[in-house]
Amino acid sequence: MDFHKLVQLRRSYRKFTGEPIDAAQLKLILEAGLMSPAGKRKNPWRFIVIEDRETLKALSTAKAQGALPIAGAAAAIAVTANPADSDTWIEDLSISAIIMQLQAQELGLGSVWIQMRLRDDENGQPASRNCARILGLPEGTETLCVLALGHPDEERKPYDLEKLSWEKVSGLTK
């Protein structure tokens, strides 16, 4: 599949069939993340793969809204770092996360980015801190997002190229 088509097809999937993800597919997704560009090549990320049903369910309650797809995912990847390791950790982790999502799409899997950084649970506690507690992460580790992964159990149409927001682009000469 060419890259443009891959980007056009990549959508957020929030419903999954429950069918497991092949270990080789998970490895390819992680390899894609590990090959991502990073500022000064510091590679500040730490990826935590979660397949345990109870842990997925617990992570789905880490923030007040929007995390329920984690509970129904076949697997999830917590995208984490210690901010002290790099001043570009947010950018580096964001790049690696979308590259992993693109790899998942290319493999025929669905994914959705569940934002944890700067989000709170129903009691006002930081979602990132909840993730650290649930996953047993070292002190100082921040969770940018959790990627919920699985075989899609919903249809999503590709982006309609005719409906792109070209009004938000300037300086392009035709």
Stretch-by-stretch model annotation:
Residues 1-174:
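Acidic, surface-exposed loops and disordered segments
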